[in-house]
Amino acid sequence: MWRPHLVDTARLKYLGIVDALEADIRAGRVTPGERLPPQRAIAEALGVDLTTVTRALNEAQRRGLVSAQVGRGTFVRDEPAGDEGGGTPLDLSMNIPPQPAEPDLRRILPQGIASILTSPRGTLAMHYQESTGAPADRTAAASWLAGRVAGASADRIVVTSGAQAALFALCALLLGRGDVVAAGAVTYPGLKAVAAQQHLELAPVAMDEQGILPEAFEAVCRERAPKLLYLIPSIDNPTTATLPADRRREVAAVARRHGVLLIEDDPYAPLRSERLPALAELAPELTWHIATLSKCSTPALRIAYVLAPNAAAAVRLATVLRSSVLMAPPIFAALATRWITDGTLTALASAIRAENRQRQSSAASIFSGLDFAADPDGHHLWLHLPQRWRAAEFADHAERAGLAIVPASAFAVSPHPAEAVRISLGIAPDRGMLEEGLTQLSGLLTQPAVGSRAVV
């Protein structure tokens, strides 16, 4: 049976236990299938508390070293992970919503598709559709948007295969090579990708804790003459800022004065408890509103709705989509319509919001005393680093510790972004694993910052 001991060089005791166990497994001192001592016995042997041992065994499971069997104990796996990095990293980089226990997507997704295929609409769901979307889907989309955007009508809506496809098509429709797009000083990386592909210039707009500054937007309009402003007004990605109602009105007024079009990317609005006026309400003649379902249900449902300024504009966007993706996936569009009409989508958004709040509460406790921004309804946070750390180096150190996060450079439009990282809370399979990862990150912040790679 394994003789518990610690690797003294580990930065945290529980990691010292795991590192010692892993070394013994690799060296053959502990054999596959061997049962480990009870947790209490390990704690007594090492002079640590039971919580430390529990964390150690959870980490050992994450690394693929052991498996726990209810009622029998913890056993060394037959094929422990052989990766040098110590197992599969905990991904805190992908901004995916947590999957709630109920409604269970693994159950309702296949059930919903099967139900559609056996319904009167089943045959149509396997046919080509209009590039604007089927009438039933556009009507359902209008009802879904009605609670957040006054005046949304089906004839102004285009059903698309996700927000990124919608953004690419909108830029292709509205802009030409060399045109200037204004965006926050840090912004959604998908916009940067589109700008690079379509040879657009990005002009950074200064931000504070509430989002872009109207006076900074005004200055960019005078100095760079952008054709379009892109923004995420609710729970911004990555900063988590939400534009207050008054500031939204100011931004709309600036856009109207300078004739600047607006792309309002609003994926997180269904998760927010408080309703704020959409830019599509404040400046409907200028605004293209994107409402994806990925953040309030699952990225597997590749559906986003675009609310155009008017019906004719919706048809023009559909023409661009016809030449690229042709149409949104009909089976998913039909499923989204069903979930809107039977209340499933509302239930999913509500369950995700509740889980987000639990995870944000855990993060706030673990990161207490640190400088970070978060929205209780969102599933990411924006962590400002201590002065000794650079964001890229911290992200690299985190990766070496088995944690994936995103440095500010991935979002930067301005040349000198803040030393900050985005941490996504949703993809961790459970709160326990998330808390373990956040605790590791918090511990990493206390270490001296050193260069992650040798320079020769």
Curated annotation (Swiss-Prot):
Coiled coil (UniProt feature): none
Keyword Methyltransferase applies: no
Any one biological process term the GO annotation gives: biosynthetic process
Keyword terms, alphabetized: Aminotransferase, DNA-binding, Pyridoxal phosphate, Transcription, Transcription regulation, Transferase
Location of N6-(pyridoxal phosphate)lysine modifications: 295
A molecular function GO annotation: transaminase activity
Domain HTH gntR-type: start-end pairs: 11-79
Cofactor entry: pyridoxal 5'-phosphate
Pfam families tied to this protein: Aminotran_1_2, GntR
Family, as annotated: In the C-terminal section; belongs to the class-I pyridoxal-phosphate-dependent aminotransferase family.
PANTHER family for the chain: HTH-TYPE TRANSCRIPTIONAL REGULATORY PROTEIN GABR
Protein name (record): Uncharacterized HTH-type transcriptional regulator RHOS4_30730
Source organism of this protein record: Cereibacter sphaeroides (strain ATCC 17023 / DSM 158 / JCM 6121 / CCUG 31486 / LMG 2827 / NBRC 12203 / NCIMB 8253 / ATH 2.4.1.) (Rhodobacter sphaeroides)
